[in-house]
Amino acid sequence: MHPLAGKPAPKKLLLDVPRLERAYHDGRPDPVNPAERVTFGTSGHRGSPLDGSFTAAHILAISQAICDHRRETGLTGPLFVGIDTHALAEPALVSAVEVFAANGVDIMIDASGGYTPTPVISHAILSYNKGRTSGLADGVVITPSHNPPEDGGHKYNTPHGG
């Protein structure tokens, strides 16, 4: 058993959320540095503003790319958007929604501002698209999934739900 099991976390292990948020908003990725570029893994882009791999600039660019993709492929249904409990989820949500709104995308988001697990977004997309051949929905989840608490993530879900 870990020696800290059942005990409050020591201050040195706690995340400095204001520092993280400042780095998210103020960070300017260097496009020459591959570690700071937008990089999609198995399910979206993940990284940390502390190393320049997840900043507002990343989210703005990814969100605009999603809008461009929707326009190019004729996706006109709603975009289901969810977030998790990671510290950067809410700042990244604001960045993403600004881009989606500026592009006239119909956004479906939890009305109470709550957290939305990834499978809920997938289910919403599949339920909405069932029996449709046009006006299909897709989705975004602001989450780094299982990554460390200082990370952020931006996942895109196609009209097939994943």
Label each residue range with its predicted role.
Residues 1-98, 133:
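An N-terminal, well-structured beta->alpha segment
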Residues 149-162:
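Metal-dependent DNA phosphodiester-chemistry modules and their immediately adjacent helices/loops
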Residues 11-14, 19, 23-26, 103-115, ...:
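Phosphate-binding chemistry for phosphorylated carbohydrates and sugar-nucleotides
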